[in-house]
Amino acid sequence: MTKVLAIDVGGTKLSYVIINEKGEFLSEVKKTSTAKKIEELIQTFKNIIAENEKDVDMVAFATAGAVNIENTKVDSSTPNLPKGYNDIDFSTLSQKPVFVENDANAAAWAEYKVGAAIGEDNNITITLGTGVGGGFIVDGKLLRGKSGRGGEVGSMKINGRGRVCTCNRKDCWESYASGTGLKFTAEEVAENDPIFSTSMFKTKQPKEVTTYDIVAGVKENDEYSIKVFNNWKQDLITGLINITNIFDPETIVISGGMGEFINTQEIENAVNKEIVVSPIKIKLAKAGNYSGMIGAALLACEKF
């Protein structure tokens, strides 16, 4: 049996677990906050590896950013991670072999091998969390592109509302369809629509309304929250329509924390009404919020 220490590095939290070559968990998932300073984050990595290294054959990271799988570095990191993240040589963190993969690519591979898209050689996994990522399986292979940055759908331009993304570009899909995007939309509606004055959050400043406030408000039938969520949902659908028309997949799998809040059948129906290719299926990830770790572990086993 091959044992892999899999570590998922997100913008706000870091998870880790030991996984075998079948994608099965051999330990409990542990979580901690993602450090905001690069020195503290590197030390966190070292502590996790030191705690588990003797029990595993290799280490696999699933991380945001454009990953160079040949030199175990992140060539271009996300603004959600500390400055200096792309200077880390992950191979130096352990005496065991180290594999690094983009988190969305890893999630896509997990869904293809053991999750919601088994046997579907053309499928896409979209991760909806703090940001938006995409992993593309084309004819049974991961789409990487010439520089390893293929599938960065979060940077796709949509709308024309001039919203500034965390990357400082305007109108990136990520700035609309992510959890951060939902917060931006909440602020946008609060500042421009009188409906906010009658909402359950009317005593807050627009910038104080959180993603979780909106989700809670929808459950309470708060009209402001429902409008915000519907606007966010339409921005999500717009991006999915564009992706579907370009890649013609069999299935789109939705992964990440924001996926918990959507009705996949509703989204599927809306997308299929607007596309020019064959109808698609939209599913929630079966590998769950740990698909990145599973996929990274499976890919590491294939490499080593």
Question: Each PLM stretch: what is its role?
Answer:
Residues V4-D8, M58-A60, N123-T127, T166, ...:
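Short glycine-aspartate micro-motif
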Residues I118-Y176:
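Glycine-rich phosphate-binding loop of actin/hexokinase-like ATP-binding domains
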Residues I19, E101, N105-K113, G259, ...:
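Glycine-rich phosphate-binding/hydrolytic loop that grips phosphoryl groups
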Residues D55-A64, F99, D248-G257, K283:
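Short glycine-rich phosphate-binding loop at a beta-alpha junction
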Residues S33-K46, M58-V59, G65-I124, T264-E274:
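Glycine-rich phosphate-binding loop and adjoining helix at the ATP-binding site
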Residues K3-Q43, K73-S76, G148:
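Short glycine-rich, Thr/Ser-proximal phosphate-binding strand/loop in the N-terminal lobe
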